[in-house]
Amino acid sequence: MSRGFGVTAGLDPEIASPLAARCQELGYSSMWSNDHPGASGLETLAEYAKGADRVDLGVAVIALDRQSPEQIASEVDRLGLDRDRLWLGLGAGFTEKPLTTMREALPGIREALPGIRLVLAAMGPKMSALGGAEWDGVFFNWMIPEFAAQAREWVEQGARDAGREPPPVFGYARTAVGTDAEGRLAEDESFYRDMHQGYRSHFERQAAPEGTVGVAAENAGDAQEELSRYRGLDTVVVRALASATFEDMGALARALTTTVSRAR
């Protein structure tokens, strides 16, 4: 299991670039950003690339109801992103038929974005199986370790049904360390729990108490132990719940580093 490091899109470039350099030095395999209406995940990846020349760069995820594949391709080119380093996470957003949308969109996405590894955002068994059958990777958000293991089985079953090797499985593990860790995790989680029916069903499926879907620990040792339980993931992405400063982000990255291998 390799380890990536992730932040929220729009992180100050003066922080993002040196943070990526620090994470590369520490042995992280990849740097990740989400994408949201207020900030571009691809722009955050471009800042990472200025500071780190070896780690993979991933965005998880861009919603196809907000950006078309052609728009994404244009941004990749404008920003000068190296396609060989990219993991491009894509999701259905608020479309009415997400499974159909992502199944039917894939050929056009591949045509618009050649040479880029495409990662499907999934929550339930059907989307997970689709990712296993047709995509280059599958990405999960907000999960307990037991769900990660179950999700991996769904992905692998989809791959078996399609007669192919299973693609890598990625996931964000929201992680806070310190005396206020539980509060920070609960606050971030509460925003997503009622965002839309997909997330409501996702949290209900896991049946985990509110404020516990992720890692909240008083010290780095306990956090490391919790992260090690996400064995269902090929790459666990530490989604940092820390102040948006280089000092705090860098300290968390250092505390949670481990020996990793490139996710290829």
Where are the language model's segments positioned?
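Hydrophobic faces of well-ordered beta-strands that scaffold small-molecule active sites
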Residues: 3-9, 29-33, 55-61, 86-90, ...
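Short hydrophobic interaction/assembly module
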Residues: 53-71
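Short acidic active-site motifs
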Residues: 15, 43-44, 126-127, 180, ...
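Residue-level preference for nonpolar/small residues embedded in alpha-helices
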Residues: 15, 40, 71, 101, ...
